[in-house]
Regions:
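Hydrolase catalytic cores
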Residues: 92-95, 113-119, 144, 202, ...
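Subtilisin-like serine protease catalytic core
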Residues: 30-72, 76-127, 141-144, 156-158, ...
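Active-site-proximal beta-strand/loop segments in catalytic clefts of secreted hydrolases
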Residues: 45-49, 72, 94-98, 110, ...
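Surface-exposed, proline-anchored Ser/Thr-rich loop/turn motifs
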Residues: 330-347
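Extracellular S/T/G-rich loop segment that most often corresponds to the catalytic His/Ser-adjacent loop
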Residues: 47, 207-280, 284, 317
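Short acidic, glycine-rich surface-loop motifs adjacent to enzyme active sites
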Residues: 136-168, 191
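Autoinhibitory propeptides
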Residues: 1-23, 29-32, 210
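Short, compositionally biased serine/threonine- and acidic-rich segments at solvent-exposed termini, linkers
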Residues: 323-331
Length: 347
């Protein structure tokens, strides 16, 4: 049986504002239209700070419904989670945001545990340990998913640097820990990194972890964003696993405005929220089954490559796969016809 939310938001462009394009690119508007908007799902957000999340109007509904929970500030700042960097604010907004006609996120009805693990003003390997501590706490709360819009490769102390050969899922501590979290049944979603244009070029840790969804960035036409990190992993696995919007993606700024920006920091939570909605529809499925359906639904699933991975998922097709419905039965699942599954061929 499917576990749907009561219909409380229209799944149509005007109502979603700038949140419509990332939703429809993944076919997740269809899930929202069925009432699957993340209710009952718990998402841990491990990031660099959540400035003004306790005040911004876009999070008012989630606050009033007590769906935003303070996890931990791994750096033990007296100022607290809501006084530091705005990166986590923007990331959270792409999922949890609910500001009708301006921006509605991909999982506006989910619960969120917030964790500050990243020191946005310096880069040291201890931040990977902060992430591990937060992930352990998130696991203890029973989160279903974890979003990590962070990536580690080069540090302020160059003796700490990772190398491309380290990206095997077993070397960087944060990648080891994310693999363990996935093995424990958490669906871990992380950004592929923004090093595609740099000398580094590849994904960054923990995108090399095993059993996760690392997410690269595409534009609105489904084309690879030049900054999005490339695969494969050091041990030859397809990376990133999938793609989502990361070019001119809408997000809430800590000053209350809605802005648009680029980065796999946006593509990861956009996909994470949509994944939560899919899992809401199939609560009996495991994280691994949800992950496999998402990868199998992507438009390059049978011909993956090092820039787009398996491509852009289609949550409608993932839904059909989880419901054990083949393509011949697709029309009975709800969409009017199967040509809704087609994507533009990225160039």
């Amino acid at each position: 049986a499917f576990r749907a939310s009561p219909i409380n938001a229209q799944a149509e462009p005007g109502h979603y504002g700038k949140g419509w394009d990332p939703l429809t690119q993944l076919g997740a508007d269809w899930l929202h239209g069925l009432g699957f908007r993340g209710e009952g799902m718990w998402i841990g957000v491990l990031d660099a700070g959540f400035e003004n999340v306790d005040k911004l109007p876009i999070f008012e509904t989630a606050r009033q419904q007590e769906r935003i929970h303070e996890g931990m500030d791994a750096m033990a700042s007296q100022a607290g989670l809501y006084a530091h960097h705005r990166h986590g604010t923007s990331v959270l907004g792409t999922m949890a945001g609910f500001l009708p006609d301006s921006l509605i996120g991909t999982a506006p009805d989910a619960h969120y545990w917030l964790y500050r693990t990243e020191d946005a003003y310096s880069e040291f390997v201890i931040e990977e340990d902060y992430w591990i501590a937060a992930a352990e706490h998130a696991d203890s709360t029973g989160v279903d998913l974890i979003n990590t819009s962070l990536g580690y490769s080069l540090f302020d102390d160059s003796t700490m640097n990772h190398t491309a050969q380290d990206l095997d899922g077993h070397t960087a501590r944060i990648s080891q820990a994310m693999t363990w979290a996935a093995e424990k049944g958490i669906l871990c979603v992380t950004s592929a990194g923004n090093s595609g244009n740099s000398e580094w070029h590849y994904i960054t840790a923990p995108a090399d972890a095993h059993g996760i969804l690392s997410v690269g960035a595409v534009n609105g036409a489904g084309q690879h964003a030049s900054f999005s990190g490339w695969g494969p992993s050091a041990d030859g696995r397809i990376k990133p696993e999938v793609m989502a919007l990361g070019v001119q993606a809408a997000y809430p700024h800590a000053d209350s405005t809605i802005k648009q920006g680029n980065g796999t920091s946006f593509s990861s939570p956009i996909l994470c929220g949509a994944s939560a909605c899919l899992w809401q529809a199939f609560p009996e499925k495991s994280a691994a089954e949800i992950r496999n359906a998402i990868i199998s639904s992507a438009h390059l699933s049978t011909q993956p490559n090092d820039s787009l991975g398996h491509g852009i998922p289609d949550m409608r097709w993932a839904f059909a796969l989880l419901a054990n419905a083949g393509a011949a039965n697709w029309s009975s699942m709800g969409p009017e016809n199967s040509d809704l599954l087609l994507f533009p061929n990225p160039s």
